[in-house]
């Protein structure tokens, strides 16, 4: 029977992580469980840096961006000996289960702990919206608003100077954030990992727009697709139009979470406690068609596929 749980945030921070921690803590305390917060993700778990959390520990946290527990990259956690130390630290503290809030790398850590016999629940916390088994991740909608606001501002200056603007959006190898922001921001061109990209084809489309009288344009592109400064130089050379690239970078991860992210994080945090009390370990939480769901974390990582919103892409093309 579970009496004490641990909670940590791992990987890149996302708006709503604090709300998720709050959801976990308050739901657990309501059920009579103790909660230990683990500082700086798996690194803090390995180094045994933990603190007892109560209701006041998470007061005024629901509206705060980032994660008050901190986060860190810790690739050494792939080492089974490192994980064995982490599990020993958990057991030494009397912790019976662990809630992990983070992206796919964080899920991989939870999967490996699960395979070693320690029950974990994964909550999807990443702006990339690239986690399998869920329609949306904690932080995605806040980041979407941030990106759209940036696109709106870029459009103001691009139209003033009849310029082509390239905006690089986070997402790692998932184009969800780019695609949604491009549609909401009225971008003329969208470049995402899920669709084959050829810069000559992009230039041809831009030239076609210019021939129709288009004075400016915005190209939204997912990070890691190419060097955006080189792409800007190529477009300017081929079209004769001034072209500038803007990398939004880590500003996309910051800021107070929007209401939907706060609600999603709170629901998922409380649901994680429900699952643990029902005897479920080794699960990851998602939301599908606005219903909370859970999947086997090993199966989710190894076998599940995340569909690309191809219908959204087709819609976007009609709006160019």
Swiss-Prot record:
Pfam families: PFK. It is found in: Cytoplasm. InterPro entries: ATP_PFK, ATP_PFK_prok-type, PFKA_ATP_prok, Phosphofructokinase_CS, Phosphofructokinase_dom, PKF_sf. ADP binds at residues 22-26, 55-60, 155, 186-188, 212, 214-216. Its main location: cytoplasm. Its cofactor is Mg(2+). It is an enzyme of class 2 (transferase). GO terms for cellular component: 6-phosphofructokinase complex. CDD domains: Bacterial_PFK. Mg(2+) binds at residue 104. Its EC number is 2.7.1.11. ATP binds at residues 12, 73-74, 103-106. GO terms for biological process: canonical glycolysis; fructose 1,6-bisphosphate metabolic process; fructose 6-phosphate metabolic process. Homotetramer. Belongs to the phosphofructokinase type A (PFKA) family. ATP-dependent PFK group I subfamily. Prokaryotic clade 'B1' sub-subfamily. This is ATP-dependent 6-phosphofructokinase. It comes from Salmonella arizonae (strain ATCC BAA-731 / CDC346-86 / RSK2980). The gene is pfkA.
């Amino acid at each position: 029977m579970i009496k004490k749980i641990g909670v940590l945030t791992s990987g890149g921070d996302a708006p709503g992580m604090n709300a998720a921690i709050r959801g976990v803590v308050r739901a657990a305390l309501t059920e009579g469980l103790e909660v230990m917060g683990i500082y700086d993700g798996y690194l803090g778990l390995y180094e045994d840096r933990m603190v007892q959390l109560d209701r006041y520990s998470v007061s005024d946290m629901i509206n705060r961006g980032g994660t008050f527990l901190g986060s860190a990259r810790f690739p050494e956690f792939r080492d089974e000996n490192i994980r064995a130390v982490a599990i020993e630290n958990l057991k030494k503290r009397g912790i019976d289960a662990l809630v992990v809030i983070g992206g796919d790398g964080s899920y991989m850590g939870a999967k490996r702990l699960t395979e070693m016999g320690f029950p974990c629940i994964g909550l999807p916390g990443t702006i990339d919206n690239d986690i399998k088994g869920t329609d949306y991740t904690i932080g995605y909608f806040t980041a979407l608003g941030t990106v759209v606001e940036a696109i709106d501002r870029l459009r103001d200056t691009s139209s003033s100077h009849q310029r082509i603007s390239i905006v690089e959006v986070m997402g790692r190898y998932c184009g969800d954030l780019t695609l949604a922001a491009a549609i909401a921001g009225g971008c003329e061109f969208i470049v995402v990992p899920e669709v084959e990209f050829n810069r000559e084809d992009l230039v041809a489309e831009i030239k076609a727009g210019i021939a129709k009288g288009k004075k400016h344009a915005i190209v939204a592109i997912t990070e890691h697709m190419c060097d955006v400064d080189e792409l800007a130089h190529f477009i300017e050379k081929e079209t004769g139009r001034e072209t500038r690239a803007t990398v939004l970078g880590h500003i996309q991860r910051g800021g107070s979470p929007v209401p939907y992210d706060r609600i999603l994080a709170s629901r998922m945090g409380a649901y994680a406690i429900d699952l643990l009390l029902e005897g479920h370990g080794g699960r990851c939480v998602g939301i599908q068609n606005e219903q909370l769901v859970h999947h086997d974390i090993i199966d989710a990582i190894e076998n599940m596929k995340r569909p690309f919103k191809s219908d959204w892409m087709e819609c976007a093309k009609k709006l160019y």
